[in-house]
Amino acid sequence: MNIEDIFANNRTRSCEYRRERRTVSLRRAIELCNGEGRRGLIAEYKRRSPSGFSTDEDISSYLSYVKMHRIAGLSILSEPTHFSGSFDDVTLAHRIGVPVLVKDFAPDDHFVESAYNAGGDAVLAILDFLPSEDVERIVRRSADLGMDVIEEYHDRKALKKFVDGDNVILGYNRRDLVSLKTGEDQDMPQYDITILESGINIDNVVHVDMRYSGFLIGTSILKRDGTLEYLEKNRII
């Protein structure tokens, strides 16, 4: 997976306005969960990933399943080449009314506008790959549109490019997007709303770090391995 090629392609992608509702804050949804003593769960849909996962489940079936559970939001992969996603998936997902993260490699503020037009409520800014100037533009444009930003990192050195904001969530991705290997948990940085991403499944969910405000989980939910039900039954979410 060539990250530079993905960014270059995303700079040429666009989406005309087709959202059907106002934005719904993902950050606020997680805060509300935390206020009730729970963690916010972001349920992710993807058709495939470079790590080797793939599914034949269509997005409508997935949405019907997860909306019956306590989720704070949805993460929808919209990158077409490596994840077989599209802005069409975002538009479909935003109709159920929960916050939608457009999970993609946002290269600039123009991509934010397309994510908004498609129906997104939040975008992803990957600190490991973006210059701080672009992160700041993404945060500002998102705020203008009423959207949130998950500023994600894998390498702690990337945190020097972190841009604070009232619409910002800090996410730690345990997966290295270059090597695609999943690393061990790190010491959680101090921030008011934080999420843990990648590698949470039924085999390790009992040990999940409860210091995080929320979790982003995709593969294990798509596999129906019981992780979602475990989190719900034990009132973690």
Curated annotation (Swiss-Prot):
Pathway: Amino-acid biosynthesis; L-tryptophan biosynthesis; L-tryptophan from chorismate: step 4/5
HAMAP family the UniProt entry points to: IGPS_A (MF_00134_A)
Gene3D superfamilies from the UniProt entry: Aldolase class I
Family, similarity comment: Belongs to the TrpC family.
Alphabetized GO MF terms: indole-3-glycerol-phosphate synthase activity; phosphoribosylanthranilate isomerase activity
Pfam assignment, any one: IGPS
Top enzyme category: lyase
UniProt KW Lyase keyword: yes
This protein's name: Indole-3-glycerol phosphate synthase
Origin species: Thermoplasma acidophilum (strain ATCC 25905 / DSM 1728 / JCM 9062 / NBRC 15155 / AMRC-C165)
Lyase found in the keyword field: yes
Gene responsible for this protein: trpC
Catalytic reaction annotation: 1-(2-carboxyphenylamino)-1-deoxy-D-ribulose 5-phosphate + H(+) = (1S,2R)-1-C-(indol-3-yl)glycerol 3-phosphate + CO2 + H2O
Highest taxon, organism lineage: Archaea
Any single biological process term in GO: L-tryptophan biosynthetic process
This enzyme's EC code(s): 4.1.1.48
Keyword line: Amino-acid biosynthesis, Aromatic amino acid biosynthesis, Decarboxylase, Lyase, Tryptophan biosynthesis
